[in-house]
Every structure is written in structure tokens, then in C-alpha cells.
């Protein structure tokens, strides 16, 4: 498998192309997309001839647009903007602007004319990526306008669209969105981006499992007791209150990010390491998720909402005090749930998923708890020893750690757990790419491995939809409140069904964990 991974990772050629960003004046474009493209440029990963067209509603000249982007690079680019002013200037020469009202059909006719002009002037083939950095309710409108003017046609070059989550608001709306997109774009033209899958350390879960002979043989129900997946955020909803109150944690985090991480952790080895084989195996996991019946929701899902709390001698707002949030909102900002994957590898092994806002630290990790040795020879001699763990830290301070028992030096046989860890920061010569850098480059070369396929989207919605519907229908299902800077409602520990078990509380700095 290791050789297969090495062969498949050889760099594909990046063809000359045009990238159109709808919503180019928005936060996502300024903070993430344009800095990522600039970093690819600094790393010499972009083709010789390329153009980036910002498509925004504001009226402004090319010069003003380039000045705006230069300021964004200086503020948000990781490296390079201040250190390489000449590089920044040469990058800006590839950036253009066209005023587009996304709801105006005529503006897309003008966009088509502008693309044709740039293609001819710059000698760039009509290989085009359309990035939908816009509110989801505009996806179908923009796609329809592109189709109307033939901007989806591939006779003169390939065309691809990238859409951000959420991919629908429910199973039915996801199916409807796909139907409308597919009226003019094939599945292999649609790239559904999930930036979690673009994280280097999420991708490394597959390499950790499938290229190491001492991990994969124990990655199953015979040796694994349980799996924990945590994605905690220290901040509240901030300025996203209006969006969040209609979405909630289940739609914002569980349905996409964390179920995708679960799929990577639980999937079978693909026969070959290519896009379709990997996605075939990951979707099988999502399709094997055991449905949670309405009568089982309270025992398997805990939802919470943060409340006003005094933190470090300052009052931190509760969720209901956030701007755009209803004063009696029952929207969840925390979820902990127990999930089962009903297949041969994982039958009856619980996966515990936890995510929330206003928690003590911003941490994302996967913890594989192994079963104890069949005979506890040193049970009476242990000093705070727990079962063995494999900890896959996704962020921050990314790395992998193995937690196991060792004898304390000195007389007798006292045993305690120690940590053997690898940290990505130790690879000083290798920079960890930002998720959007990797994902944009993958789309440019036509690699959809790390993008969500429609069957995976449908499978994840099919799993969470009944829970959301029951919450809406049944007000008696509890919504627990928790203080900011805590690990959520204490009721989340009841999911383990064992008073001796509780959620792992990770440190922000993995090296002290």
C-alpha cells in the first residue's frame, strides 16, 4: 500500500486555466481563497498562463481591485507578501475583475464576453473553475445563469464548479440542489469542498493506517474499545448568529466535517489509491451508520447551548445574547453523540463524536482507545494508568501519539502511562499547506479525492435528518445549557454508560498532552 500511495502522489501537470471567484469581495475570498492562490504562486505550483477573475457586485476598476487584494495579502497571507513585494506585484498582474450581480442574467452574458476576451488576449484555453464563494441560496441561480450562456460547455476546454457547504439544508434540499446543478454539470464537474478533508493531518490518517504494519492489523473491533472524535472551538458564533440560528451544530459540523473524518478513520483500505476508490470506501462507512430511532435520540445524542459566563473576570455572552439569535432560541451550539458503524470491521464498537463552541480550547483530534490486555498482570501496581490510546491530533500542534504503560524507575513494578509522540512541527523543512491551498490545487489538476461525492452527501443527510426532524417535532427532548470555557454539558459523559469513562480533555499544546 505504501508504494501505491507514493506512485499516486506524483504531481499531475497543472494546465493553463482561468479561475472565476463569485463573491470575490467577501470574507472567504479575502481571508482564505486569494491568500491560498498566492501561496501556490509563491510555491511555483500554478501554470505558466493563468488568470483569476474576481466576480463581485461592487463597481470598481482593475487597479482598485488589485489594491484591495494587495491589502488582503498583507493582512491574511501566511508568508511572502511583505517579504516578496516583487512576487506580489507579479501575482497581481494575473488578477482581474468583472462586476457581476449574481441575480442578473444579463451580467453573465457580459462575464462570458470578458472571459472570451481574456482567453484570447492572454492565450489561455477555456479551462475554467467557477468558485461559488457566495451564500448557498444563490448556488442554483448562478449555476442556471452559467448554463444559460453556455459557460458550462466543455467543447473548448474543461469546466468545473466548486461549492462550499452546506450542500442543502436537509436530505430533500440536497437532492434538489444536486438535480438543478446536474441539469448542466456532470458529477465529475462538481467539486463539493470540505476544508476539513484538505487538512494535511486528516489526509495523514490514511497514510498512518495503510502504510504501517503495526497500525492497520489492530484497527478493528477485536482490539479497539471505542473511538472519540472531538472538534472543539473556543469562540462563540460571533457575527454568524443569524446564519447559525437557522443551522446549528448538527448541520454546521456533524453532517459534513465530522462524519467525513469518521469515514476516513473507519473506511476499508481501497484497492488502489485513487479518487474513486478512496471515495467508494468512505461512502460505504456513511451508508453503514446505524440509524438512530426517535426513541433512542435522548440516549445517544446530547445537545447543548452555551450561556452567559464570567471568564477571566469578563462576562462572555451566552448564545441567546449573540446578535441575530432569537432570545428563546433552541438551536444547539454543542453536540455529543454515540454512533455505530454496522459492518464486519466495526460491529458494536461505539464512535463518540463531540463538537461545540465556547469550549476551553480550539482542538480537533481522533482518539483510538484500545482494549486492555486480556490478563491485567500489573493491575494492582498501576499509578493513574488508563488503556492504551492512539491519538491523531489534527489541529493545533498536529501530530500522532501513542499512549502506553511503562514501569516507573525504582524498586518494584509501579506502572504509569507515557506518551510516544510525533509532531509535524519537528519536520521543520516541510511546510504544512493550508487546506484551501491543497484543495484548490487538486481541483486545478482534476483530482476530486478530497471533495465530497453526492452519494456521501446523501448518506450523511440520511443519517442526521431524522434527528433534526425529531428535535423540531418533540420539544420534550432536552437542550442542556453549559457555561463557556467548559467541555459542554455534564450529561455528555452519560453517553459512555459507564461511570468510570469520560471524554478525554485534550491540551491545546499537543507536546504537553
What are these regions (language model features)?
Residues 1-163, 167-513:
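Secretory/organelle targeting and membrane-embedding segments
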Amino acid at each position: 500500500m505504501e508504494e501505491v500511495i507514493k506512485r499516486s502522489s506524483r504531481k499531475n501537470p497543472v494546465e493553463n486555466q482561468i479561475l472565476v471567484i463569485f463573491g470575490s469581495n467577501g470574507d472567504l475570498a479575502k481571508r482564505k481563497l486569494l491568500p491560498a492562490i498566492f501561496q501556490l504562486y509563491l510555491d511555483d505550483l500554478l501554470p505558466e498562463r493563468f488568470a483569476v477573475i474576481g466576480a463581485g457586485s461592487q463597481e470598481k476598476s482593475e487597479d482598485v481591485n488589485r489594491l484591495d487584494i494587495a491589502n488582503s495579502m498583507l493582512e491574511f497571507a501566511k508568508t511572502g507578501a511583505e517579504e516578496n513585494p516583487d512576487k506580489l506585484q507579479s501575482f497581481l498582474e494575473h488578477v482581474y475583475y468583472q462586476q457581476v450581480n449574481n441575480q442578473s442574467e444579463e451580467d453573465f452574458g457580459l462575464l462570458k464576453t470578458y472571459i472570451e476576451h481574456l482567453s484570447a488576449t492572454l492565450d489561455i484555453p477555456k479551462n475554467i473553475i467557477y468558485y461559488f464563494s457566495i451564500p448557498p441560496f444563490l448556488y442554483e441561480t448562478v449555476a442556471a445563469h452559467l448554463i444559460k450562456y453556455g459557460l458550462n460547455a466543455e467543447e473548448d476546454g474543461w469546466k468545473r464548479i466548486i461549492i462550499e457547504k452546506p450542500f442543502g439544508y436537509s436530505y430533500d434540499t440536497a437532492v434538489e440542489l444536486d438535480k438543478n446543478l446536474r441539469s448542466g454539470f456532470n458529477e465529475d464537474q462538481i467539486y463539493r469542498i470540505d476544508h476539513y478533508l484538505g487538512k494535511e493531518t486528516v489526509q495523514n490518517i490514511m497514510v498512518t493506517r495503510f502504510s504501517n504494519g503495526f497500525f492497520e492489523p489492530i484497527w478493528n473491533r477485536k482490539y479497539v474499545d471505542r473511538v472519540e472524535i472531538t472538534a472543539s472551538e473556543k469562540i462563540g458564533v460571533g457575527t454568524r448568529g443569524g446564519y447559525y440560528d437557522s443551522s446549528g451544530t448538527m448541520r454546521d459540523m456533524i453532517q459534513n466535517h465530522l462524519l467525513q473524518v469518521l469515514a476516513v478513520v473507519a473506511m476499508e483500505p481501497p484497492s488502489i489509491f485513487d479518487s474513486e476508490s478512496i471515495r467508494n470506501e468512505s461512502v460505504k462507512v456513511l451508508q453503514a451508520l446505524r440509524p438512530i430511532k426517535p426513541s433512542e435520540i435522548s440516549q445517544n445524542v446530547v445537545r447543548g447551548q452555551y450561556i452567559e459566563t464570567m471568564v477571566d473576570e469578563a462576562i462572555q455572552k451566552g448564545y441567546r445574547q449573540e446578535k441575530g439569535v432569537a432570545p428563546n432560541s433552541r438551536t444547539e451550539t454543542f453536540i455529543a453523540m454515540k454512533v455505530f458503524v454496522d459492518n464486519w470491521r466495526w460491529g458494536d464498537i461505539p464512535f463518540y463524536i463531540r463538537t461545540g463552541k465556547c469550549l476551553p480550547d480550539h482542538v480537533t483530534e481522533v482518539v483510538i482507545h484500545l482494549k486492555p490486555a486480556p490478563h491485567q498482570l500489573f493491575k494492582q501496581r498501576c499509578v493513574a494508568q488508563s488503556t492504551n490510546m492512539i491519538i491523531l491530533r489534527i489541529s493545533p500542534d498536529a501530530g500522532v501519539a501513542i499512549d502506553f504503560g511503562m514501569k516507573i524507575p525504582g524498586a518494584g513494578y509501579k506502572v504509569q502511562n507515557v506518551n510516544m509522540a510525533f509532531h509535524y512541527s519537528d519536520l521543520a523543512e516541510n511546510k504544512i499547506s493550508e487546506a484551501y491551498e491543497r484543495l484548490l490545487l487538486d481541483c486545478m489538476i482534476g483530482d476530486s479525492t478530497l471533495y465530497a461525492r453526492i452519494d456521501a452527501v446523501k448518506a450523511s443527510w440520511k443519517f442526521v435528518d431524522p434527528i433534526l426532524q425529531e428535535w423540531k417535532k418533540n420539544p420534550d427532548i432536552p437542550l442542556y445549557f453549559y457555561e463557556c470555557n467548559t467541555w459542554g454539558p455534564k450529561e455528555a459523559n452519560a453517553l459512555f454508560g459507564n461511570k468510570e469513562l469520560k471524554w478525554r480533555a485534550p491540551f491545546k499544546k499537543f507536546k504537553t498532552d
